Amino acid sequence: MKILGIESSCDETAAAVVEDGNKILSNIVATQIPFHKMYNGVVPEIASRKHTEWILPVVKQALAEAGLSLKEIDGIAATGRPGLMGSLLVGLTFAKTLAWSSNKPFIAVNHMLGHLYASHLENDIPYPYLGLLVSGGHSIICKVNNFDDIEVLGTTIDDAPGEAFDKVAKFYNLGYPGGAVIDKLAKSGNPKAANFPMPIIHKEGHKYDVSYSGLKTAVINQIDQFWNKDFEKTPENIAAAFQTRAVKILLRPLLDASIDTGLKTIVAGGGVAANSLLREKLAEHKELKCIFPSLKFCTDNAAMIAGLGYHYLKRGDRTPFTVEASARVEGFSKKGRQ
């Protein structure tokens, strides 16, 4: 089955054609970073307008690169949740209209499950495994039983790691996007320049949860309190000290979950999965098999949406054209199909 995937949940307008869940025939991503860089963050109104402008040429390019006409497409998948409402509406409405007018099967999928599926585009990964979803809006540690069946073990109780990276980068004028900039700066800095605090939340059912509000506050508002006076307060040192603590906050509950569940395969997804220190630290655990998507599949893309959509459509699932976009995902903290 050849599936056309469409993704527009935030600030990337993307379309891809994927055959049988993992054979990528095309993968087009039009990024809006230059339009949001001056604001050090995504402006929803600008994002939705750019999606409206770009969605048709991006889809046409995806079909052309795949060497296929719309008639040769077996189904259409699009992100339906979660994300920025204005952005989601553009891609979802376009996909529904295209599917209806061409009489193609249609499925709306969960963007976060798409990120979790991204590694399947390049690897044959048996279920179950331990999933790590880390992005600007989410931090989820979960047991993955199937492509649509996950059991959430832990999540963030306040801020997501990607949001912390972005806020720290914005406060210190390090650049945009924050995650990539901090990762690059940290390579030239000393992680011992500051000893930022670890959150103490791993009690009373929070063993696998994470918290980033305290770290964010410490780096932005209380940096002198935790700074090592032997080091100069440079952007590189700030980035290195912050990133080291941010990654450690993730690793502790993740490794605990691996021990407690007995799952030795960890599959990561989401924008923060591109972080080089996170990859490096997990690679040190030789007892684990840690699988990361290629960097191009960590950021938002439509190949993961098409790949995931294939499994729903193959099973016979269909989404009615009355489906509406949703900025949030209800029940994502509970066990069950998503």
Swiss-Prot record:
Alphabetically sorted, this entry's keywords are:
Acyltransferase, Cytoplasm, Iron, Metal-binding, Transferase, tRNA processing
Q: Where in the cell is it found?
A: Cytoplasm
| A single Gene Ontology CC term | cytoplasm
Name the chemical reaction catalysed here.
Answer: L-threonylcarbamoyladenylate + adenosine(37) in tRNA = N(6)-L-threonylcarbamoyladenosine(37) in tRNA + AMP + H(+)
Free-text comment on the cofactor: Binds 1 Fe(2+) ion per subunit.
Summarize where Fe cation binds, as residue positions.
111, 115, 300
Q: Please give a single GO biological process term from the UniProt record.
A: tRNA threonylcarbamoyladenosine modification
Cofactor(s) needed for function:
Fe(2+)
SUPFAM superfamilies, per database record: Actin-like ATPase domain (SSF53067)
Q: Where on the tree of life does the source sit, at the highest rank?
A: Bacteria
Principal localization reads: cytoplasm
Residues holding substrate: 133-137, 166, 179, 183, 275
Assigned protein family: Belongs to the KAE1 / TsaD family.
Q: Its function?
A: Required for the formation of a threonylcarbamoyl group on adenosine at position 37 (t(6)A37) in tRNAs that read codons beginning with adenine. Is involved in the transfer of the threonylcarbamoyl moiety of threonylcarbamoyl-AMP (TC-AMP) to the N6 group of A37, together with TsaE and TsaB. TsaD likely plays a direct catalytic role in this reaction.
Protein name according to UniProt: tRNA N6-adenosine threonylcarbamoyltransferase
